[in-house]
């Protein structure tokens, strides 16, 4: 399944929220430098959905705050 994800890097909390339109808003403590926020995004989503990190991939938006993420 694919999700549109709105990433909020440099947040005080790490959390996942479901938006009304079916997308996810994910708060990350990592900065958007050298892929750190992307790595933490995969970790947070893996924990949230109970999946392994290898089952989650960023399909589009690696360098943007709005991403499309696929979960196998």
Per-region residue spans from a language model:
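Contiguous, often N-terminal, cationic amphipathic patches that form binding interfaces
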Residues: 1-35, 39-42, 51-53, 57-72
